[in-house]
Swiss-Prot record:
The keyword Transmembrane applies. PANTHER family: PTHR13146, SOLUTE CARRIER FAMILY 35 MEMBER F6. GO terms for biological process: negative regulation of mitochondrial outer membrane permeabilization involved in apoptotic signaling pathway; positive regulation of cell population proliferation. The gene is Slc35f6. It is a multi-pass membrane protein. Belongs to the SLC35F solute transporter family. Glycans are attached at residue 110. Keywords: Glycoprotein, Lysosome, Membrane, Mitochondrion, Phosphoprotein, Signal, Transmembrane, Transmembrane helix, Transport. The modification Phosphothreonine is found at residue 366. Its main location: mitochondrion. GO terms for cellular component: intracellular membrane-bounded organelle; lysosomal membrane; lysosome; membrane; mitochondrion. GO terms for molecular function: transmembrane transporter activity. This is Solute carrier family 35 member F6.
Amino acid sequence: MAWTKYQLFLAGLMLVTGSINTLSAKWADNFEAEGCGGSQEHSFKHPFVQAVGMFLGEFSCLAAFYLLKCRARRQSDSSVEPRQPFNALLFLPPALCDMTGTSIMYVALNMTSASSFQMLRGAVIIFTGLFSVAFLDRRLVPSQWLGILITIAGLVVVGLADLLSKHDSQHKLSEVITGDLLIIMAQIIIAIQMVLEEKFVYKHNIHPLQAVGIEGFFGFVILSLLLVPMYYIPTASFSGNPRGVLEDALDAFCQVGRQPLIALALLGNISSIAFFNFSGISVTKELSATTRMVLDTLRTVVIWAFTLALGWEVFHPLQILGFLILLMGTALYNGLHRPLLACLSRRWRHPTQEGEQERLLGDSRTPINETS
């Protein structure tokens, strides 16, 4: 069935905004500007400030939800309303996981390439699958276990590509290894978030935009408050800011003031996450979860192509192999092979049936020709 213009628009919006989200965050990391107190130019390494911005973007999804709710009320549509009342504090545990995992990933993005960052996020299906078996009493079919094993192999290949790639002064080998490991660690926390959401939240049939918005609210408020103690926690050279603390929000604002393009990158990150969540949810509703997974895979290709074109990273052939293996593992885990196998079996069956019909017709025609 052909896609409608609206469905094409949603797919394009998801692909574009999802790519902008990662690329804008990496773009901000690449800027250098003076900080507070006349400090020398230094890189914009403020992962927790960026995470606060991302949660602000998620929080804005509540505005989109209430607009949909108002329109639904005018049309007497009750699909937006939850089936039963719920306590908003249900979202606090998954929001804490989201906050922790996102913050770790922004730290990791400072240490590794954007394409590796996007590819290694595929590790989430490994831990989601294992945790769903352990805590949700779910049984994985053999193809899903095979998908997990193939995904592990793909992660190893992507990691090897990072190890063997040429590294500049910005991304040393030790930083790249640490960054890759942090991304894997973050996926464990994100998988816990998904299991918590499925076990305690989704049974209330809450609209996804409302769920994202509430989690964004908790993440924004809590992480904003945590920026205060982070300003005083020493971390030596790990943080990358002049004061050597876990996060220097004041330095971030000073750098933004001296380099307006950083503000543009942050604005792109904040707005893109809101539109990405909206379009992703809409694609799942209008098309399918499989389509959303395919578009997310294409997003990795777009990010990779842009980072290579902009010279942000060096091409390594192993990354192609690793990406293809990850793609195969993700497709198997999500059941994308089933419609493909069904299509192939139909194509295989039809020529065989046609051949059998021809033989039957041929056999039936021969006696007639002979008698005539």
